[in-house]
């Protein structure tokens, strides 16, 4: 947490020390709110074994960008989503407790120093978590686990217009994962554990407007650790070198605007972290729902 505080202190110093009221540009703001609901229901006399269900997902995506001075540009991206599935028993037709279907809390701040060179230095901070950890049903844990990533290096904008941007960056990164682990389900006791590692990070962001109704966004994150705080604990086990593998997080979204408030979105995500699973994890969501743009 001290490293997080130091990052923001340095960023604020650059922002306010180098900016001037004459030069400062206005904020570029974008906030989208969305709600998707799917519902099936059957009467008690219905035959065939079908059961009713209700699935809902609420989301909020926002981007705040500002040029504080001739050389300092700051961009904060936040993505929040949470959804549940309510299912009905096939025999009794009673509704079971809802289960979580979607959960995401992702905030990233990127500060670039535009020196009019081939590449621009940058500092970045990213916070990743979920609203509810439901891995142990007996013990509710909120905003768990927490992943903090601080990085710095060089970046380059390969393509940029008013509605399109392709930006890549490469740098050194430090990660800390703070986990509230359950030690006693009866007494509902937990303890806080944390691990840290450091290595090299590559992030590429793509934002393209394909037409007045279709847009595409993509984010590819690659991370290769050079050291791991728990390496001694896994030494001599089959998992000894798992932490050295490259972690992958690739997100893609195609969004189609049907009308002012109705939107269709296809989202898929590919994750690979050998410490969690030897196989890649894939998620795909096709949604039709309401979207409201605040800005």
Stretches with model-predicted labels:
Residues 61-70, 108-117, 153-161, 204-212, ...:
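Outer-membrane beta-barrel proteins
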Residues 165-257:
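Outer-membrane beta-barrel transmembrane domain signature
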Residues 35-41, 80-86, 127-133, 158, ...:
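Transmembrane beta-strands of outer-membrane beta-barrel pores
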Residues 45-50, 92-97, 135-142, 186-192, ...:
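Extracellular loop and loop/strand-boundary signature of outer-membrane beta-barrel proteins
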């Amino acid at each position: 947490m001290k490293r997080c505080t130091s990052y923001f202190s340095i960023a604020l110093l650059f922002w306010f020390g180098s900016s001037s009221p004459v030069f400062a540009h206005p904020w570029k703001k974008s906030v989208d709110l969305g709600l998707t609901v799917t519902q099936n229901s059957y009467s008690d006399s219905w035959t065939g074994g079908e059961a009713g269900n209700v699935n809902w997902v609420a989301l909020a995506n926002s981007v705040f960008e500002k040029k504080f001075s001739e050389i300092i540009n700051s961009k904060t991206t936040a993505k929040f989503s949470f959804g549940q599935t309510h299912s009905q028993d096939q025999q009794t037709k009673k509704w079971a407790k809802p289960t979580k279907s979607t959960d995401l809390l992702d905030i990233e701040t990127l500060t670039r120093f535009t020196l009019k060179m081939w590449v621009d230095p940058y500092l970045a901070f990213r916070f990743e978590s979920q609203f509810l950890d439901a891995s142990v049903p007996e013990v509710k844990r909120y905003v768990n686990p927490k992943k903090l990533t601080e990085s710095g290096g060089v970046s380059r904008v390969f393509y940029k217009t008013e509605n399109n941007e392709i930006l890549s960056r490469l740098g050194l990164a430090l990660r800390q994962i703070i986990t509230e682990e359950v030690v006693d389900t009866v007494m509902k006791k937990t303890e806080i554990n944390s691990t840290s590692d450091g290595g090299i990070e590559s992030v590429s962001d793509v934002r393209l407007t394909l037409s007045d109704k279709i847009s595409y966004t993509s984010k590819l994150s690659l991370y290769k650790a050079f050291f791991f705080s728990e390496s001694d604990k896994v030494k001599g086990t089959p998992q000894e070198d798992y932490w050295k593998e490259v972690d992958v997080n690739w997100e893609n979204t195609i969004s189609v605007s049907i009308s002012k408030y109705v939107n269709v979105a296809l989202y898929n995500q590919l994750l690979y972290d050998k410490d969690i699973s030897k196989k890649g994890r894939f998620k795909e969501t096709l949604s039709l729902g309401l979207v409201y743009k605040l800005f």
